């Protein structure tokens, strides 16, 4: 089963594609949709065009996205919510339904601790996939963690 995991952001959007089969997960591709500083409308367009490219190059059985985290700055929350809304609409138009996980759910699924640091998540992602190299930046490891969380959740539901 091919799963796309997405870690939305207003500067970079991490994405990861894994193949999940009988409890074994293989990383197919991971990267960033880089969003250049510009007006919000152009940034959202850039994000959606990046997602379009991913869907043009791959087909997916499942898509999972990390929910936005709580931020203290209301402007940040509003901007992230707009990016998240655009991503949600684009995924629904191209693929259909998708799963959503909070950052705490992702951290708990990957590390066993809901309050794990991004570095701890990155360490466990590397370990769970049997990778020899570190994956940078952390937006990418977060996207992989979202995909792994969804794969684990699907195994539990089956």
UniProtKB/Swiss-Prot annotation:
<keyword id="KW-0238">DNA-binding</keyword>
<keyword id="KW-0234">DNA repair</keyword>
<comment type="function">
    <text>The RuvA-RuvB-RuvC complex processes Holliday junction (HJ) DNA during genetic recombination and DNA repair. Endonuclease that resolves HJ intermediates. Cleaves cruciform DNA by making single-stranded nicks across the HJ at symmetrical positions within the homologous arms, yielding a 5'-phosphate and a 3'-hydroxyl group; requires a central core of homology in the junction. The consensus cleavage sequence is 5'-(A/T)TT(C/G)-3'. Cleavage occurs on the 3'-side of the TT dinucleotide at the point of strand exchange.</text>
</comment>
<dbReference type="GO" id="GO:0006281">
    <property type="term" value="P:DNA repair"/>
</dbReference>
<dbReference type="InterPro" id="IPR036397">
    <property type="entry name" value="RNaseH_sf"/>
</dbReference>
<keyword id="KW-0540">Nuclease</keyword>
<keyword id="KW-0378">Hydrolase</keyword>
<protein>
    <recommendedName>
        <fullName>Crossover junction endodeoxyribonuclease RuvC</fullName>
        <ecNumber>3.1.21.10</ecNumber>
    </recommendedName>
</protein>
<keyword id="KW-0479">Metal-binding</keyword>
<dbReference type="InterPro" id="IPR002176">
    <property type="entry name" value="X-over_junc_endoDNase_RuvC"/>
</dbReference>
<dbReference type="Pfam" id="PF02075">
    <property type="entry name" value="RuvC"/>
</dbReference>
<keyword id="KW-0460">Magnesium</keyword>
<feature type="active site">
    <location>
        <position position="66"/>
    </location>
</feature>
<feature type="active site">
    <location>
        <position position="7"/>
    </location>
</feature>
<dbReference type="GO" id="GO:0005737">
    <property type="term" value="C:cytoplasm"/>
</dbReference>
<comment type="subunit">
    <text>Homodimer which binds Holliday junction (HJ) DNA. The HJ becomes 2-fold symmetrical on binding to RuvC with unstacked arms; it has a different conformation from HJ DNA in complex with RuvA. In the full resolvosome a probable DNA-RuvA(4)-RuvB(12)-RuvC(2) complex forms which resolves the HJ.</text>
</comment>
<dbReference type="GO" id="GO:0048476">
    <property type="term" value="C:Holliday junction resolvase complex"/>
</dbReference>
<feature type="binding site">
    <location>
        <position position="7"/>
    </location>
    <ligand>
        <name>Mg(2+) 1</name>
    </ligand>
</feature>
<dbReference type="GO" id="GO:0008821">
    <property type="term" value="F:crossover junction DNA endonuclease activity"/>
</dbReference>
<keyword id="KW-0233">DNA recombination</keyword>
<feature type="active site">
    <location>
        <position position="139"/>
    </location>
</feature>
<feature type="binding site">
    <location>
        <position position="139"/>
    </location>
    <ligand>
        <name>Mg(2+) 1</name>
    </ligand>
</feature>
<feature type="binding site">
    <location>
        <position position="66"/>
    </location>
    <ligand>
        <name>Mg(2+) 2</name>
    </ligand>
</feature>
<dbReference type="GO" id="GO:0006310">
    <property type="term" value="P:DNA recombination"/>
</dbReference>
<dbReference type="InterPro" id="IPR020563">
    <property type="entry name" value="X-over_junc_endoDNase_Mg_BS"/>
</dbReference>
<keyword id="KW-0255">Endonuclease</keyword>
<dbReference type="GO" id="GO:0003677">
    <property type="term" value="F:DNA binding"/>
</dbReference>
<comment type="similarity">
    <text>Belongs to the RuvC family.</text>
</comment>
<keyword id="KW-0963">Cytoplasm</keyword>
<keyword id="KW-0227">DNA damage</keyword>
<dbReference type="GO" id="GO:0000287">
    <property type="term" value="F:magnesium ion binding"/>
</dbReference>
<dbReference type="InterPro" id="IPR012337">
    <property type="entry name" value="RNaseH-like_sf"/>
</dbReference>
